[in-house]
Amino acid sequence: MDSLPDAVVQYILSTINNAKDVASCNCVSKKWKDSMPYIKSLYFPRSIFDSLKNGQTSDCVVMQIVSSTFQLEDLVVYCPFTSAGMASWLLVVGSSLKNLELRMDNLVEQNAPNDSNPSKLDCIQAARNLESLRLWGVLMVNAPKWDVFQNLQNLEIVGARLEDLALAEALRATPNLIHLVLLGCEGLRTVWIELLQLEHCKLDFYGSGSCLLTLRAPKIEYLEVQGCSLIRVRETNSLKNLSLANNAGRVYMVDFGKLMALESLSIRGVQWCWDAINKMLQLASEVKHLYMKVEFTGDFEALLPFPEIDFVDFFKSHPKLKIFDIHGAMFAALCQKNSLKNVDSSFMIPCLEEVAVTVRSPLNAEQKMNTLESLVKFGKKLKKLKIKILGMKSGHSSADDFFEEICRLRYKNHRLISIE
């Protein structure tokens, strides 16, 4: 092994990052051991220290391996560690780290941090040159003691208990973020995010679905929000992909700027106020991909059906629509208004290529069949129409007749229509 060229040894070591493998390489030969300091990436799996002996602790072993490196750039620690242990090894390698990923495991309240016993979040300050930070299982009820992370472009927090002010202070310390992900975060009520460089943002707030969100990010291109009842995003000139969902609560209001660049819109949830849905559909007139799965409307506790939607007006208002995925209530609303009997002969749906329709009920079967037939008739570029009936209520006497009509339509257009 000592006779291997340096370039070969360095290439082999560049493919190794598991801490157990790195430690084993120390035993291969003197040349390999001497090359250990040049390892750039280390990964400590969750169960790596399950069988420690002789009084060893995970903190000590992590410190031993980390301190043997020089200019470490990537560090991933999923195994258990203490704040004191974390402070010691970040003191050694923090200045060279570019990417840090930690499984914090501190969702429960612990002793209040102080100068002699800083919290795990406070310790991250030692890695001041970070470009990417990923944290799992975070307790952030107090603002972390961070200076500004000027180089940090990617921040991801998964599974967290947060307070509004603590999150606001943390984001104030990361002004140059381009990519922000907050998943499975609970405890938030009013969220204010102002990040002038932000382009990609994914927010998933766990709880009652009543969170209020205000986002100021003039460069935002991709935005995904789950769990908010009020959403305000005024600077949207660059926004191309937008997904809004609330699986637990009700969406009362949306306040967006012009969505002229929007290509994809997804609206999901149990209940949305109709004004919010209608406003999004009006703003998204240039959208190419529209996904709608909202079960009910209504401003208060009562769950109401969708009002009637004019088929012709809808497609005239969305001339660039290429992919349309429509579920139950919205499809029923699109069928109710009797606008298909006197359609202008020049009417066509110019860009529509793919449609997926979820049929939940056989009621108003004739209108629904007219709508399906109209999609085929007026969709001049239509390539695929998928009709999903797996969840259709079959107890009604007309269910079998309706299904036969759908099968007949498929038989006439077997290259175009599929039934799921």
Residue ranges and their predicted role:
Residues 140, 162, 187-188, 208, ...:
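Canonical position 11/12 of the leucine-rich repeat
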Residues 3-11, 15-186, 192-194, ...:
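Leucine-rich repeat
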Residues 208-209, 213-268:
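Acidic, glycine-rich loop-and-beta core segments that form the ion-binding/anion-interacting portion
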Residues 102-105, 292-296, 326, 385-392, ...:
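A generic structural motif
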Residues 376-420:
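C-terminal effector modules
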